[in-house]
């Protein structure tokens, strides 16, 4: 199956290229850029030398439709909203890595993203692509809104608790930490090496755009769920996310019950690995892979459950999950082309 990538020179784009070039079923038909049209991809990223020969093309929907069946949009917020209706109109399937189609309510999108939302008709058509929890909807989708990186790690951690109804609906606290690649390719003062090295920064306190995305999904599974407390931090690593989730249970529990809850929830999910009781993962242990690793603890004194969830933000948090969703759309095994062992060193 032929695929195209729009926004091929960003970090999400080049991770898609790396994965798709090794995929046994998908092949890259074309790469597209806004600012580097006519450049050979190897001139922009020399690590693709002797692997790719693609020249970056302008975005011509009619030409893309002739060559590809699936389009990956690795574009900034706002761009996908303009492009996607045109791609859908010619029969292409779209997997969007931006946040433009994650929110069903355009007013909520505009409040958190500070930009005009996509047209409501297209928003209604979009399926939220959290692979492990939306498989059946994804199978039939023409437009998949790939989840955000923080949202992916957080939702995989909290949804078993929310679905089971065992936690207080107003008690969810999520503390999240990300490597610098999560901020994208464009440099800022905050991501500048001297500013971040040997340092730690909290950002977007109470206003991160993944908050409504997480809350929307939680209320799908339990309408009584209240607003969450969510904080994000930038840490001096290239890639990786660690989410630490806290929630208060409604009644006293045993850690064995919680362990079984998670093992049962993800027993059919090849990319979610639940650690043994008392063990907790670190981002390094999933780096370069599509895995989400989790560890669970329960504090009898406070009645709180703690879940630690780690992913590679460029893989399970972006390109890896996008290809996992493309596999589902194509009727392939979810693991096809994604069976990479983590790169520990």
From Swiss-Prot:
Reaction(s) the record says it catalyses: N-acetyl-L-glutamate 5-semialdehyde + phosphate + NADP(+) = N-acetyl-L-glutamyl 5-phosphate + NADPH + H(+)
Enzyme Commission no: 1.2.1.38
Gene Ontology BP terms: L-arginine biosynthetic process
Keywords from the named record: Amino-acid biosynthesis, Arginine biosynthesis, Cytoplasm, NADP, Oxidoreductase
Keyword NADP in record: yes
CC annotations in GO: cytoplasm
InterPro entries: AGPR_AS, AGPR_type-1, NAD(P)-bd_dom_sf, NAGSA_dehydrogenase, Semialdehyde_DH_NAD-bd
Main subcellular localisation: cytoplasm
Subcellular location: Cytoplasm
Pfam families the record matches: Semialdhyde_dh, Semialdhyde_dhC_1
Physiological role: Catalyzes the NADPH-dependent reduction of N-acetyl-5-glutamyl phosphate to yield N-acetyl-L-glutamate 5-semialdehyde.
Family: Belongs to the NAGSA dehydrogenase family. Type 1 subfamily.
Protein name according to UniProt: N-acetyl-gamma-glutamyl-phosphate reductase
Organism, scientific name: Bacillus thuringiensis subsp. konkukian (strain 97-27)
Gene name for this UniProt entry: argC
């Amino acid at each position: 199956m032929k695929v195209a990538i729009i926004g091929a020179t960003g970090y999400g784009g080049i991770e898609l290229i790396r994965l798709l070039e090794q995929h046994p079923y998908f092949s890259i038909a074309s790469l597209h850029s806004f600012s580097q049209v006519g450049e050979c991809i190897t001139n922009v990223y020399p690590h693709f030398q002797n692997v790719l020969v693609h020249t970056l093309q302008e975005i011509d929907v009619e030409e893309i439709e002739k060559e590809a069946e699936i389009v990956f949009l690795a574009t900034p917020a706002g761009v996908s909203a303009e492009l996607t209706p045109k791609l859908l109109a010619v029969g292409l399937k779209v997997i969007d890595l931006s946040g433009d189609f994650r929110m069903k309510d355009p007013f909520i999108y505009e409040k958190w993203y500070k930009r005009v939302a996509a047209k409501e008709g297209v928003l209604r058509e979009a399926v939220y692509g959290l692979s492990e929890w939306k498989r059946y909807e994804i199978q039939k989708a023409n437009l998949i809104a790939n989840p955000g990186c923080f949202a992916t790690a957080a939702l995989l951690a909290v949804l078993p608790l929310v679905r089971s109804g065992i936690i207080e609906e107003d008690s969810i606290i999520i503390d999240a930490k990300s490597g610098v690649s999560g901020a994208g390719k464009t440099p800022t003062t905050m991501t500048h090496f001297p500013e971040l090295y040997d340092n730690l920064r909290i950002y977007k306190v109470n206003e991160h755009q993944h908050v409504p995305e997480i809350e929307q999904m939680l209320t799908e599974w339990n309408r009584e769920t209240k607003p969450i407390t969510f904080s994000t931090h930038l840490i001096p690593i290239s890639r990786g996310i660690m989410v630490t989730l806290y929630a208060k249970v409604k009644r006293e529990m045993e850690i064995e019950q919680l362990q079984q809850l998670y093992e049962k929830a993800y027993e059919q999910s090849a990319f979610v690995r639940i650690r043994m009781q008392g063990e907790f993962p670190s981002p390094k242990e999933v780096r370069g892979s599509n895995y989400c690793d989790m560890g669970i603890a329960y504090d009898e004194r406070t009645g709180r459950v703690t879940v630690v969830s780690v992913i590679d933000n460029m893989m399970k948090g972006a390109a890896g999950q996008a290809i996992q969703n493309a596999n589902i759309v194509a009727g392939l095994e979810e693991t096809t082309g994604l069976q990479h062992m983590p790169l520990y060193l």
